């Protein structure tokens, strides 16, 4: 039991014939094979649908440490589906993940995911339930012949970094106080309702005094 990181230094008191109870990991190679076989079986079962599952939305990682990166989320919000013109019940049947709990906090995230949905919808090859009687929105017979199973993630998400050229730091940038500005912005957001209420009460008192 070697010490791990910055924890307390242990003084273990072993009893119960502990050498017979050591947890071993000799099943790892077999587990790896079993997982691979399960993935292949699932891919065969759901073919010609994408092997990696439904399309996921672009979401920004939480906290200041990671919010510069984007990754795949759980599901598209109901607002995103509404703007894209896809019904929430239909979405799940055509390989679009839905998360009714998610809320869009910015216009940029909403627009990015709506665009993602529209692009996916344009590329989608939709098989008719009855081959003899295809419905509106189903793909043509020529498109169905071209259909192949996608092995990787559906429309993979990439982090794009823009390189900036080196330049001289301006005086305004030198004097800018980032931490104080963030604190002030948070305080203004927190006290917005209280200040609005006080301003309204003060305005009402002024009206009463004038009377």
From Swiss-Prot:
Q: Any signal peptide, and if so, which residues?
A: none
Q: Cellular location of this protein?
A: Cytoplasm
Q: What is its main location?
A: cytoplasm
Which Gene3D superfamilies does the record associate with it?
Answer: 1.20.5.110
What are the record keywords, sorted?
Acetylation, Cytoplasm, Isopeptide bond, Phosphoprotein, Ribonucleoprotein, Ribosomal protein, Ubl conjugation
Would the keyword Cell membrane turn up in this protein's UniProt record? no
Phosphoserine modifications at: 52, 77, 106
Q: Where is this cross-link: Glycyl lysine isopeptide (Lys-Gly) (interchain with G-Cter in SUMO1)?
A: 174
**N6-acetyllysine modification, residue list:** 16, 177
Biological processes per GO annotation: blastocyst development; bone development; cytoplasmic translation; translation at postsynapse; translation at presynapse
Record's InterPro entries?
A: Ribosomal_eL13, Ribosomal_eL13_CS
Q: Which domain of life is it from?
A: Eukaryota
Q: Which GO terms describe its molecular function?
A: structural constituent of ribosome
Quote a single Gene Ontology cellular component term: ribosome
Disulfide bond annotation, renumbered to this chain? none
**Quaternary structure, from the entry:** Component of the large ribosomal subunit.
Question: Which family does the entry's similarity section mention?
Answer: Belongs to the eukaryotic ribosomal protein eL13 family.
| Main function | Component of the large ribosomal subunit. The ribosome is a large ribonucleoprotein complex responsible for the synthesis of proteins in the cell.
Q: What is this protein called?
A: Large ribosomal subunit protein eL13
Q: What species is given as this protein's source?
A: Mus musculus
């Amino acid at each position: 039991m070697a010490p791990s990181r910055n924890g307390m230094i242990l003084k273990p008191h072993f009893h119960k014939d502990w050498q017979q109870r050591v947890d071993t990991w000799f099943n790892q190679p077999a587990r790896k094979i079993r997982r691979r076989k399960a993935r292949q079986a699932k891919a065969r079962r759901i073919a010609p649908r994408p092997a990696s599952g439904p399309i996921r939305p672009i979401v920004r990682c939480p906290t200041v440490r990671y919010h510069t990166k984007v990754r795949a989320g759980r599901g598209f919000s109901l607002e995103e589906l509404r703007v894209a013109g896809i019904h929430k019940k239909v979405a799940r049947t055509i390989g679009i993940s839905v998360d009714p709990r998610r809320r869009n906090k910015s216009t940029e995230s909403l627009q990015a995911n709506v665009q993602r949905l529209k692009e996916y919808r344009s590329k989608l090859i939709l098989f008719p339930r009855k081959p003899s009687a295809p419905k509106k929105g189903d793909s043509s017979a020529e498109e169905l012949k071209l259909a192949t199973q996608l092995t990787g993630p559906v429309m993979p998400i990439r982090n794009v970094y823009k390189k900036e050229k080196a330049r001289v730091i301006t005086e305004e940038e030198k004097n800018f106080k980032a931490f104080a500005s963030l604190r002030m912005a948070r305080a203004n957001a927190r006290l917005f309702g209280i200040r609005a209420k006080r301003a309204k009460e003060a305005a009402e008192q002024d009206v009463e005094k004038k009377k």
